[in-house]
A protein has these predicted regions:
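Helical cap/lid subdomain of alpha/beta-hydrolase-fold lipid enzymes
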Residues: 3-170
Length: 170
């Protein structure tokens, strides 16, 4: 790191748990930045032309991982344990109460965006991107209450026992 404040903090961190991390970028960023005219127009309309979105393009993340970031294949390891929780699917059935955790409208949106992604995705990130850095602690259905999948939205909410799992892990 180039910032003199960080080594002291880094030396004290023993474990990081990342929820659906974007270690490998997302094809959704590729689509809204450099996709067909419909995808780019949609990205513009929704305000997804920012530098943050550009940096999540798969090719940009490949470059970061190859040159700068630690913990990915063929790179130095991280100074402390980096564990990930991977979300593998999205459910948005109107009759299923689980679909409302984190907001039903968000689930529907992630069902749509899942069409640009692999069959294993949380609606925003492919499982391969989420599991690229560090060690996978678990993939959603293997530990969540009821074996429920965690969408990208749900992995940031109080859904399916996730907060208790995190609390018990720490």
């Amino acid at each position: 790191t180039w910032d003199s404040r960080y080594p002291n903090i880094i030396s004290k961190v023993t474990r990081t748990i990342a929820l659906a991390p974007s270690s490998g970028g997302t094809p959704l960023a590729d689509a809204v930045i450099a996709g067909n005219s419909f995808e780019q127009s949609l990205g513009w309309l929704l305000g997804y032309g920012s530098d943050a979105v550009k940096q999540q393009q798969v090719s940009w993340m490949e470059s970061y991982n190859a040159q700068w970031l630690y913990g990915t294949p063929n790179r130095p390891s991280l100074p402390s344990r980096f564990e990930t929780v991977v979300g593998s699917d999205v459910e948005s059935a109107v009759w299923d109460s689980d679909s409302y955790c984190g907001g039903y409208q968000n689930q529907v949106g992630l069902e749509v965006t899942q069409n640009w992604l692999d069959s294993c995705s949380d609606g925003f990130l492919n499982c391969s991107s989420q599991s690229l850095a560090g060690v996978v602690w678990f993939t959603d259905k293997s530990r969540t209450q009821g074996g429920e999948p965690l969408s990208h939205q749900q992995s940031r909410r109080n859904c399916f026992g996730l907060p208790n799992m995190l609390k018990n892990r720490i």
